[in-house]
Amino acid sequence: MTIKEIQEEIVDEFSMFDDWMQRYEYIIDLGKNLPIIKEEFKTEENTIKGCQSKVWLQGEMKNEEIIFTADSDAILTKGIIAILIRTFSNQKPAAILEANTHFIDEIGLKEHLSATRANGLVSMIKQIKMYALAFNAKN
């Protein structure tokens, strides 16, 4: 699937819920299925700066696509990074760099987060794009 198709799928899923309490529960459930980063990669280098919670993100290239794994010490944040990994993992670096993140606004996520969590979301996206930039430069 393309990034755009995945984003559209996520928007459709979020539109099924009537209120934000249900959406928060769904985000938390998504976090339970997060591809967890190996303990050896839970380093300061892989910590996303600007997040209220501890968030680790690691990316590696396989078959010309970036595979992301992550973890967080907060259940809601774990769900947020799970949404981003679902969107951007198994994609080519150039596709990640070209992708927009308007779907975040479409599902209303940023406006329903505290200011510090919203800043953390921006930091997570920025870190994913940095991985894509680095891997794209290597190719």
Model-derived features with residue positions:
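Alpha-helical support elements that line or immediately flank enzyme active sites
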Residues: 81-92
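N-terminal intrinsically disordered, cationic/polar leader segments
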Residues: 3-54, 61-66, 104-139
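Short Cys/His-based metal-binding microdomains
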Residues: 77-79
